[in-house]
A protein has these predicted regions:
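Non-catalytic, usually N-terminal nucleic-acid engagement modules in DNA/RNA processing proteins
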Residues: 1-168
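Glycine/Thr-rich beta-alpha phosphate-binding loop at enzyme active sites
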Residues: 141, 160, 171-186
Length: 186
């Protein structure tokens, strides 16, 4: 099941293990369903339990007792939605996002580079580049800005992944991206 090349040619149902667990199922039960891949979330795992703790535990797979594929979403959507909620305070600019978690009051910074570092500490098989996720009813000009920022961030993620970790050839991990653009197909 660790043949990540299959992901390039096949579709997978990936249950949401946002915080390192699929709700209402044990890892054993999840395996019994035939599930081959799960999706976790960089932002939520950054906040709790934290990438350093996950790394000390041997990565998300050991922490969960999971031997399938793990895709880790970059956290772009969560940053967008949580910063614009009343509980979270923060900002997004060309460098990335800065925000304060109401959970424990800590301030975090998520940049394209730190997103890759966190996903590597988590031990993800498929890393997702940080994206500038915005509301879907944007004016076309704002959507274009979001697409341009997402592309810039994706390039920064890729450059960091290759420079610091040796890229896919050295790590065996895949790097992918999220397509933005609101409701504008072009």
């Amino acid at each position: 099941m660790n043949d990540l090349n299959r992901l390039k040619n096949e579709y997978f149902f990936m249950p949401d293990a946002t915080r390192g667990a699929v709700r209402y199922l044990t890892t054993k039960q999840l395996k019994e369903t035939g599930t081959e891949a799960i999706v976790t979330n960089t932002l939520h795992l950054l906040i709790h339990p934290g990438p350093d703790i996950i790394q000390k535990l041997g990565g998300i797979k050991k922490m969960m007792g999971w031997d399938g594929i793990v895709l880790t979403d970059s956290g772009g959507f969560q940053v967008f939605s949580l910063i614009h909620s009343k509980k979270w305070k923060g900002s997004i600019d060309e460098d990335g996002a800065k925000f304060k978690s109401p959970r424990e009051g800590n301030t975090y910074e998520l940049t394209p580079e730190s997103s890759i570092d966190i996903q590597m500490k988590i031990g993800s098989d498929v890393l997702v580049t940080l994206d500038d996720c915005r509301k879907s009813d944007l004016e076309k000009e704002e959507a274009q800005e979001s697409v341009e920022r997402t592309i810039k961030w994706a390039k920064r993620c890729k450059d960091h992944f290759e420079k610091e970790y040796g890229g896919t050839k050295k790590t065996g991990k895949l790097l992918t991206c999220v397509v933005q653009g609101a409701n504008y197909p072009e």
